[in-house]
């Protein structure tokens, strides 16, 4: 389970690393898609917290 969560985290991170600089470099694109990036950032932070909790629980067992 943790491996799948980490893989998802890697894919979201790769997507953000590629798309955010492109959106910032393209005139007007950041304003148009700011809410989408905000949701992606929130998902990324949430996933980090879920992975930390899952790892803590699995190591305590």
UniProtKB/Swiss-Prot annotation:
InterPro entries: PSII_PsbZ, PSII_PsbZ_sf
Localization, UniProt: Plastid, Chloroplast thylakoid membrane
Main subcellular location of this protein, as a coarse class: plastid
GO biological process: photosynthesis; photosystem II stabilization
Keyword terms: Chloroplast, Membrane, Photosynthesis, Photosystem II, Plastid, Reaction center, Thylakoid, Transmembrane, Transmembrane helix
Function: May control the interaction of photosystem II (PSII) cores with the light-harvesting antenna, regulates electron flow through the 2 photosystem reaction centers. PSII is a light-driven water plastoquinone oxidoreductase, using light energy to abstract electrons from H(2)O, generating a proton gradient subsequently used for ATP formation.
NCBIfam families listed in its UniProt record: PS_II_psbZ
Transmembrane segments: 5-25, 38-58
GO cellular component: chloroplast thylakoid membrane; photosystem II reaction center
Naturally occurring in which organism (per UniProt): Trieres chinensis (Marine centric diatom)
Protein name: Photosystem II reaction center protein Z
Domain of life: Eukaryota
Family: Belongs to the PsbZ family.
Topology of this chain in the membrane: Multi-pass membrane protein
Subunit structure comment from the entry: PSII is composed of 1 copy each of membrane proteins PsbA, PsbB, PsbC, PsbD, PsbE, PsbF, PsbH, PsbI, PsbJ, PsbK, PsbL, PsbM, PsbT, PsbX, PsbY, PsbZ, Psb30/Ycf12, at least 3 peripheral proteins of the oxygen-evolving complex and a large number of cofactors. It forms dimeric complexes.
HAMAP family in the record: PSII_PsbZ (MF_00644)
């Amino acid at each position: 389970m943790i491996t799948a969560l980490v893989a998802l985290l890697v894919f979201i991170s790769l997507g953000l690393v590629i798309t955010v600089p492109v959106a910032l470099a393209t005139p007007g694109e950041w304003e148009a898609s700011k809410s989408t990036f905000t949701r992606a950032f929130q998902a990324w932070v949430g996933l980090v917290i879920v992975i930390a909790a899952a790892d803590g629980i699995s190591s305590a067992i």
